[in-house]
């Protein structure tokens, strides 16, 4: 049994490995009926933190020095300062409830880091233990990815990288959860001498890289590049400063051989099944032609704009997802919001100001500094320095993730980050302690334990409420997304607790509840909930669209239009917002409002918006309004193959009276045509085209009739209007012109026209083409 220096039973030595394994395995906690598995994972983290706290309280006399050791370095002080500053954001946050949820999470991560540091201080062979634990976890994650790939191939014959989730919620989390563990496997390869272990561990590296090649997260490819460069630098330095042995340089094979083999297998076996890693890697660039990169750059610009305007106090921790809607409002489709800025660092700057950004960045900078000091000045063994350097490489992988994604919101990757930071801190403090004993500050122990207790107990309450909410949101969001009302009305108020007050997609929960009361026509109850919903998220305007619906159902069209206008101008790219506002403009015959909405309505050139605008405008503007005609013409240029747009253009440019009159002339012309009176048919068809010069059918009919009576020049003039100006792309007009050319004695000139007509799908052209052009 483990004993301390006094010969007494040491419970920390016994329990430290168990608790550390518990932390590191948090990523395996499943959804447990929640919308997102992070909810039960945060609960799990809180519970393990509380278990650690109970042990620390029971062993408080033995850990006095350790607590001083882990809480007094600048890294820890910066981290504590960051949490304190984040806590203050509760008082100025857009949504203080959401700030509270996120403050609770960050307090848990802080205590997890400090707890890990205390546990690692009391753990022998910590480097081996952590590396073996993470290697085993990595093997399980790889297995899950390979199972996904095999199932996809067996089911569909291809691999769908976007669906390669493994044991996590999405492929980016899976990819970085795998990549960040590779340095620990490389350390074991360096450490162990048995060839069988080296082969086993090298195989794990190969399978990890092969998994990443199938997942195809480009950011993880950059992470792999950092690992390769870092490991190469390590082996080169060891070669220069230590052995000068070729064997040292050959150690590069432990990363290069698996890498080349993974690429080869990917290209030979997997690329043809939808997961070509080389082609995917080739798309890594800063080009704005890439949709994903363009989106991230837009998010970064919004964040930096906000920081420049709010350098001290931001939106409040966890509140950028709300303010981002305001910045990105013209590009948001539906209610899919930019939930994260895809860079933890600058997002924290937007949420907590420059001070919060610098405090968080300081944690990383101090970690890098500690590694440099340890490697440069420590008298530790090459084995320990190798491990610490590889910790820095792993931290670099996390930093790439943190600059391109949002690992700060995901416990699965955060636990590894906390372990890395804790290990760096412990090794640095051990180095300092070797030169000069670290002074124990007895007062820190009761302060630390008391603050931990005061923070963690409420944290359990809040994280559990969030978990219960995410279970209830499963039902609310299923109904919301399918526009159904399966949840009974008597369960609506109790299906989720009051924390948080927005869904995982930022829709106010009270507003989602209100839709059930709107459906039940309990309007007063619904309006009260919607007022609360607006306060929870004032930028999404879902509450306003429901208020508009309520007032319209009550016959209060002006009030309905006021709220529909707010919703439309708030999120103009939302089809529900635009269609409701246009409908109310039409009902109230408000031409001024339609004119005001035009620019935003057509900004993205969406077919339905243009069509709805033209339909409503045609009833509000006078016939042949010049401005409206120009807009209708522009619509035909944007959507040249859409018959509804063409019909609306004709109706607007000619007027309904003109369209009807032309149709009447055309009908008379067809009557003459059917009895072979082509002269009178031509007269009626020409009346039709003069009345409605935008309908190509009138020109085609007139040209055909004139062709049949031998009026070839006029027929050619009329059919040229169709080809050159109206361009219906139906093949018929080219066929008619070809017949005119043949009758004029120019069959050679007719052949290109017949070729075009045949290829456009006009079947009558085939026989004529074969007769004259073969």
Question: Model-predicted segments: where are they?
Answer:
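Flexible juxtamembrane loops connecting transmembrane helices in multi-pass membrane enzymes
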Residues: 163-164, 227-228, 247, 263-301, ...
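Transmembrane signal-anchor hairpin modules in multi-pass inner-membrane enzymes, especially those
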Residues: 1-88, 96-101, 111-135, 188-200, ...
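Register position in tetratricopeptide repeats
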Residues: 519, 553, 587, 655, ...
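TM-adjacent membrane-interface loops and short helices in multi-pass inner/ER membrane proteins
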Residues: 290, 295-338, 345, 352-359
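Canonical tetratricopeptide repeat
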Residues: 512, 546, 580, 614-615, ...
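Alpha-helical transmembrane segments of multi-pass inner-membrane proteins
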Residues: 2-30, 45-56, 83-90, 102-118, ...
């Amino acid at each position: 049994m483990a004993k301390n220096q006094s010969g007494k039973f040491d419970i920390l030595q016994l329990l430290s490995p168990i608790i550390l394994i518990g932390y590191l395995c948090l990523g395996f906690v499943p959804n447990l009926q929640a919308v997102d598995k992070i909810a039960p994972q945060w609960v799990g983290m809180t519970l393990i933190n509380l278990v650690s706290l109970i042990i620390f309280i029971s062993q408080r006399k033995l850990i006095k020095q350790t607590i001083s050791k882990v809480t007094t370095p600048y890294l820890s002080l910066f981290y504590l300062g960051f949490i304190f500053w984040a806590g203050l954001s509760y008082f100025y946050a857009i949504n203080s409830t959401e700030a509270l949820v996120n403050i609770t999470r960050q307090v848990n991560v802080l205590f997890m880091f400090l707890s890990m540091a205390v546990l690692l201080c009391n753990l022998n062979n910590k480097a081996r233990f952590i590396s073996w634990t993470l290697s085993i976890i990595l093997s399980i994650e790889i297995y899950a990815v390979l199972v996904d790939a095999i199932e996809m191939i067996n089911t569909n014959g291809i691999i769908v990288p976007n669906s390669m989730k493994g044991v996590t919620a999405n492929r980016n989390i899976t990819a970085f959860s795998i990549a960040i563990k590779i340095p620990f496997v490389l350390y074991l390869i360096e450490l162990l001498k048995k060839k069988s272990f080296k082969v086993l561990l090298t195989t794990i590296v190969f399978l990890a890289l092969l998994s990443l090649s199938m997942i195809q997260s480009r950011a993880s490819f950059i992470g792999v590049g950092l690992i390769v460069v870092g490991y190469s630098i390590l082996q080169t330095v060891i070669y220069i400063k230590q052995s000068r042995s070729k064997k040292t340089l050959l150690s590069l094979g432990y990363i290069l051989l698996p890498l080349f083999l993974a690429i080869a297998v990917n290209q030979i076996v997997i690329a043809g099944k939808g997961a070509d890693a080389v082609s995917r890697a080739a798309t890594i660039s800063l080009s704005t032609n890439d949709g994903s990169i363009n989106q991230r750059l837009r998010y970064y610009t919004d964040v930096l704009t906000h920081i420049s305007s709010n350098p001290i106090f931001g939106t409040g921790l966890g509140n950028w997802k709300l303010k981002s809607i305001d910045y990105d409002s013209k590009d948001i489709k539906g209610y899919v919001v930019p939930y994260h800025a895809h860079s933890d660092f600058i997002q924290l700057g937007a949420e907590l100001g420059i001070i919060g950004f610098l405090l968080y960045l300081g944690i990383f900078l101090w970690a890098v500094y500690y590694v440099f000091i340890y490697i440069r000045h420590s008298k530790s063994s090459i084995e320990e320095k190798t491990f610490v350097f590889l910790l820095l490489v792993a931290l670099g992988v996390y930093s790439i993730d943190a600059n391109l994604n949002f690992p700060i919101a995901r416990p699965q990757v955060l636990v590894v980050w906390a372990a890395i930071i804790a290990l760096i801190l412990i090794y640095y403090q051990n180095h300092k302690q070797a030169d000069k004993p670290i002074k124990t500050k007895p007062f820190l122990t009761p302060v630390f334990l008391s603050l931990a207790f005061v923070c963690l107990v409420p944290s359990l309450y809040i994280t559990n409420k969030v978990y219960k909410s995410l279970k209830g949101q499963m039902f609310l969001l299923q109904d919301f997304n399918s526009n159904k009302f399966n949840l009974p009305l008597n369960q609506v108020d109790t299906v989720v607790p009051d924390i948080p007050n927005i869904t995982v997609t930022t829709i106010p929960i009270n507003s989602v509840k209100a839709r059930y009361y709107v459906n039940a026509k309990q309007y007063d109850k619904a309006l009260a909930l919607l007022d609360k919903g607006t306060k929870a998220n004032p930028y999404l305007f879902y509450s306003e669209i429901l208020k508009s619906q309520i007032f319209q159902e009550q016959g209060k069209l002006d009030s309905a239009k006021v709220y529909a206008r707010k919703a439309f101008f708030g999120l103009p790219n939302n089809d529900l917002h635009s269609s409701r506002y246009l409908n109310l403009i039409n009902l109230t015959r408000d031409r001024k409002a339609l004119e005001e909405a035009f620019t935003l309505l057509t900004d993205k050139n969406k077919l339905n918006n243009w069509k709805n605008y033209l339909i409503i405008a045609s009833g509000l503007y006078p016939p042949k309004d010049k401005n409206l005609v120009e807009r209708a013409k522009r619509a035909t240029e944007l959507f040249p193959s859409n018959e509804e747009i063409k019909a609306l253009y004709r109706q607007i440019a000619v007027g309904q009276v003109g369209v009807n009159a032309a149709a009447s002339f055309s009908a008379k012309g067809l009557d003459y045509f059917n009895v072979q009176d082509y002269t009178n048919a031509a007269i009626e068809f020409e009346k039709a085209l003069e009345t409605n010069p935008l309908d190509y059918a009138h020109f085609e009919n007139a040209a055909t009739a004139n062709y049949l009576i031998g009026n070839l020049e006029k027929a050619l003039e009329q059919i040229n209007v169709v080809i050159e100006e109206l361009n219906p792309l139906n093949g018929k007009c080219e066929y008619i012109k070809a017949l005119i050319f043949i009758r004029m004695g120019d069959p050679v000139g007719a052949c290109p026209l017949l070729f075009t007509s045949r290829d456009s799908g006009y079947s009558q052209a085939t026989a004529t083409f074969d007769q004259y052009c073969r």
